[in-house]
Amino acid sequence: MKVRASVKKMCRNCKIVRRHGHVRVICSVDPKHKQRQG
């Protein structure tokens, strides 16, 4: 999980999701693409 000021999709399988006031990126193909805005 990377914590970044600006989250972007890293591949076409990444999805941007808003959970508990945080913007997250989840990826079913590559778990390294997980990010959270912080």
Swiss-Prot record:
GO function term, MF aspect, one: structural constituent of ribosome
Protein family according to the UniProt entry: Belongs to the bacterial ribosomal protein bL36 family.
Span of the signal peptide: none
Keyword Phosphoprotein set for record: no
GO biological process per UniProt: translation
Keyword Ribosomal protein: yes
Protein name (Swiss-Prot/TrEMBL): Large ribosomal subunit protein bL36
Keywords: Ribonucleoprotein, Ribosomal protein
InterPro entries (alphabetical): Ribosomal_bL36, Ribosomal_bL36_sp
Pfam families: Ribosomal_L36 (PF00444)
Superkingdom of the source species: Bacteria
GO cellular component annotations of the record: cytoplasm; ribonucleoprotein complex; ribosome
